[in-house]
From Swiss-Prot:
PANTHER family reported for this sequence: NARDILYSIN (PTHR43690), ZINC PROTEASE PQQL-LIKE (PTHR43690:SF34)
EC number: 3.4.24.-
Cofactor(s) named in the record: Zn(2+)
Cofactor stoichiometry and binding remark: Binds 1 zinc ion per subunit.
Top EC category: hydrolase
Cellular-component GO terms for this entry: chloroplast; plastid
InterPro entries membership: Metalloenz_LuxS/M16, Pept_M16_N, Pept_M16_Zn_BS, Peptidase_M16, Peptidase_M16_C
Gene Ontology process terms (BP): proteolysis
Protein name, UniProt field: Zinc protease PQQL-like
Modified residues (N-acetylmethionine): 1
Annotated source species: Arabidopsis thaliana
Amino acid sequence: MDLIAGESSKVLRKQGFRSLKLMSVDMEQELGNELEPFGADYGRLDNGLIYYVRRNSKPRMRAALALAVKVGSVLEEEDQRGVAHIVEHLAFSATTRYTNHDIVKFLESIGAEFGPCQNAMTTADETIYELFVPVDKPELLSQAISILAEFSSEIRVSKEDLEKERGAVMEEYRGNRNATGRMQDSHWQLMMEGSKYAERLPIGLEKVIRSVPAATVKQFYQKWYHLCNMAVVAVGDFPDTKTVVDLIKTHFEDKRSSSEPPQIPVFPVPSHEETRFSCFVESEAAGSAVMISYKMPVSDLKTVKDYRDMLAESMFLHALNQRLFKISRRKDPPFFACSVAADVLVARVRLHGFSEREISVVRALMMSEIESAYLERDQVQSTSLRDEYIQHFLHKEPVIGIEYEAQLQKTLLPQISASDVSRYSEKLRTSCGCVIKSMEPKSAATIDHMRNVVSKVNSLEEEKMIAPWDEENIPEEIVSEKPTPGDITHQLEYPEVGVTELTLSNGMQVCYKSTDFLDDQVLFTGFSYGGLSELPESDYISCSMGSTIAGEIGMFGYKPSVLMDMLADLETALQLVYQLFTTNVMPQEEEVGIVMQMAEESVRARERDPYTVFANRVKELNYGNSYFFRPIRISELRKVDPLKACEYFNSCFRDPSTFTVVIVGNLDPTIALPLILQYLGGIPKPPQPVLNFNRDDLKGLPFTFPTKITKEFVRSPMVEAQCSVQLCFPVQLTNGTMIEEIHCIGFLGKLLETKIIQFLRFEHGQIYSAEVSVFLGGNKPSRTADLRGDISVNFSCDPEISSKLVDLALEEIVRLQKEGPSQEDISAILEIEQRAHENGMQENYYWLDRIIRGYQSRVYAGDLGASCKILEEGRLRMRESLAPQTAQAALQRILPHPCKKQYTAVILMPQRSRFGFLSSIFSSRSEGPYIRDTKILAGIAGLGVVVFGIWRYSRK
């Protein structure tokens, strides 16, 4: 059957890896020339700046740029703690050539979105500025490189610039002071104890952020930002590297640092033989955890032996993680209480080692990974290559090229034995710079308790009282009896989208698209109409737990711990789908007990998280307390009927005739079609239809948006004050121009997000970021009905000014409805959308989603090509018609007009003390409309499993 030509190239490339010759290696041979990283045009300018330039065509007409600076927070003095990060912020605010965040506006105007395509990061040792820009016009690359040149020596540090940026930096600081941030900071300080690193977290100190003078920031910038400590990296779809090198010279060659090159000091982290213990109590923690860390000297990666040792270490970590996963899936896992069982893993390896079978599984996995990298060596993302060169500059990590690395791994991996891997465990002794830390929501473990556990494990090891690892039996084949292949009863070609659609003899519809984006990637997903929305409310809770219970029991006929040892190729994946449809999951009391215990722990964890409490209340409020959006409570979990849950899960994956499966990737039809026919076509069709729903007869989700303005505070106990705001508006799209309206609301979401960030961050300096999201997922998949949903604005801020910022955000949206956006605003969001579309057209994920949307679209009437064409034409019509006037009209039409007449505003705030609450009762009228305290509800969100992209479709 002639499908799409040229697919035999994948087979040839795989044969290319398999025929890759083994090397005769000298262990002392150097990996490569440190001064000549593979693939790059590499050099140094007279002023000390290093450059790396490389041609790479993925994605097409794009370039990944970076300025890497060997300057981080560890260089700060006590009164400068946080200044390195502040400098990074100021870079995008103003330079000699750019003011008032003009850099951000310019980059957005060429389609480089703020955040994803223009960003920076500060660590203890370095600062990295990153840009991802289009280069289809010659001047764009030059302008982008000129911006990096400005960052190198022309950042403006004035009092006005600093004052405007303090709020954004402070909000980033506040956002880091949640449970996760506090635990990470505490662990960092414990690990780095005795070193300057322990007291130089990049985010800095609140008092410095709020009050550091501009002169101090400028002094730090001028002292440390020296060109000899910088490198510029450019990887992209360039005609040639020489032109790019010339651009770098044009923009950087005349730059001069204002002082002599500073010597970057080294701050050693002292080792210690005694084990350090710490018990950290975090009332908002999601659960209890123990972290065991070992400090080791950094190993140079210079010789083949160094590389072999690195592979052995990686194999050790893979094998140990596999054991940990398998322990977590046992009937009595030791992870719900402090137990010796989890701590003997490394000691067991020292005594008994890993088995050859375990290491053969790890070796096969790593060989598969390097084979995939080799096959896709010409399809590596420019951002990945850019990051390699950044690490070469900052940490002297060798860049040796994937061809050489594949040859090395193919030669070395078979030579690394189980005993070689097991030997690595000798480095992980509690006398080798070991730090053990417990983290709990309530104090239970003590340092003495942990010290006794370590002592007991050491004694058991000395007495050789630790039993060997008990291995599970792994089946030779996932499908023991191969099914009889089905037939193709109908075939259609859609050349306009490059897909082939098959109807199989069991009724399953399979659509596939062959691509050459990645030589070793195939994605697939499947859907069927009818899901949880079709159930009565009384069955909802039990049935919604079906995928969770089935996932732990073994929805493919095997435990998850058994399947993890199998390599995933197309045949294996299709076999798992066959098993999904033919396995009858039956709940066992012991297994179900473990699953429900884990679910209860998850609910309790979410009760402790203020942000989950907040999100649950937002959903309750915006969707009329609908059971579909309400969090599951522990009392409801305890009423779950496991048998009903599993029966529902089994019924969802019983009738193949209700499913459409879409496959996208580098498919060789001569290999893929027989597998599709055997494992998808071989799924038996039941004698009577099961859950066979007509799309137009499905129910929408039961929800109603408040008809009146609703403003509410959610007050939650917090260790440190946090504040999150969600401002939400109802939307309704009418059927007459539905395709254009769906695209239009996407553009409006991006417009609102851009303007809110510009207004609240760049103009008022009070937020770090904002997100605008659109929800239309509660509607039934109808061809004719209107769509209703909501559009929400989310940001975090200082609790003291949250109400003020809500009012400012509302005023900005009112202004946009009244005056409309500028042409500059419209041009920027059109450019961002177009660039994202162009990037997506080169990705399998994008095409998978596009085809699924084609099938699920209201215009789909059996012709996928026509559906995709109508959707794309709607997108193009929307782009052509979008202008300041049409955007203004859409804001008035789709949102309430004026927007202040119907909305919800929910604000997460720290819980007040009882005395504060009592006193506020008498003054609540002066607080304005935000006077309602809410009941805090515990919840668990999204307990579910996506299994190889197969799900039952319940709502669009």
